Amino acid sequence: MIILSHRGYWKSEEERNQEVAFHRSFDLGYGTETDIRDIQGKLVISHDMPQGNEITFEELLQIMDGRNLPLALN
C-alpha cells in the first residue's frame, strides 16, 4: 500500500507545506502530494499564490534526502 500525505504530514493548519510537515511525512516513510508555483524565477511549494516565504522545490528535494518515496506534484 502506498500512503501519501497531503501537503506533508501536518498536525495543525499552519504546518501545511512547511518543512516540519515534510520531515514528519518522509521520516514515517510516507510520500506526499503538494503543489508547485513559480515566483521570481524560483519553483516554490505553495497551494495558493506564493507570498515569498515558501520553501523551494529544491529544499523539498533536500528534505527527501534521496529517499525513494512517491512525490505527487500539481
Please place each PLM-identified region on the residue numbering.
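Phosphate-group recognition and catalysis centered on beta-loop-alpha active-site segments
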Residues: 1-74
